Amino acid sequence: AYYLRALSNLEKEQPFFQELFGQDVSKYDVTRLKRAYNDFLLISNRFKGSKYANDAENRLVFLRNSMANHEVYIANYYLKRGAFIASSERAKYMLETYPGAPASKEALIILIESYNKLGSTNLAIESAKVLTTNFSNYTYTIDKNDLVVIKDKSVDPVVEESSFFDFGLF
């Protein structure tokens, strides 16, 4: 019964058109995802060894990551609209609530950018240290305006390739 309830909450959150068009469920209300998460967590904890427990644990990972992505989506929304305190609070909440989630990198970058916009250089530096410690392909520097600048070492600078049009033929 718990398993069916969890599946029901999960399926209500993933309608046919969202799956068909590849929409990200984390961009919408996650109330049902949270309910499904709690139901699958109950199954995982209470019914260890059952045929549903393994599936429940796999779905817990998906749901946790979806809810973490939702928090990052909201934090980014606030950041784009200039609500830097709200953005930083949402990113911190994501990092505290879903530690180790794949969206942690994005949350830290949002946190750094929010702190830069708020003029909180020390907090931006602390966040940059966490980012560079956990994601070794990132480095940071402090520019002349006391802003933390993040660089992803894995991204190559854009190299302009010559093309047919470069030879003056067109």
Task: Give each language-model segment a name.
Residues 1-170:
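Acidic, polar-rich low-complexity tracts and alpha-helical solenoid repeat scaffolds
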